C-alpha cells in the first residue's frame, strides 16, 4: 500500500522481472525472483526503493547485454533518482548447469555450422541423432572435438565433418554430454 510506504518514508517497491513469449501474445514468468532487485540492506543505496528498466530491450554490446535502469530512494522527503547499468552475457537469461546429458526434441537444420554459448570447466561433447535416437554417422560424441572454456560463440566440430550441410532439412535431435559446465544456447548457422 502507498500509505504504508509513506508512513515508513520509503518509495513503493518496484523491481524488474523477466517474462517470455513464444508468440508475442501470451507471456509467461516462470521464476518470480526479480531479475534486478531493489537493495533493502544498504542504507542510501542507489536502488533502495524503486527500480525500473529504462528501455524495453537491452543493448547488445559485443558479447554482453546492457540493461539501463533507473533507481530511486528517499533522503528525508527528497526523492533521489539515479541511473544504473546491469550487464549480462549474451543469451544469458537461462541455462542448464551441471554434469550430465541433455537431449533436444526433433529439430530441422538449415545451416552448416554448429555453435554453442557455454561455460565449461570440464568438457562438452555433442552428437546428432536421427528421429529414432540413433547416432548419425560422422556426428557421434566420440567424433566430436571436445569444447572447454567460456565462450558465447564456440563452434562445435566433428572429426572429418566440418560442415552440417549434408543434414540440411532433416529432422534431428542434438544430445549434449556436459562435464561440469553451463550451456546457455546453441544454434546452427550458414556461416
PLM region descriptions:
Residues 1-191:
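Carbohydrate-active catalytic/glycan-binding domains of CAZyme proteins
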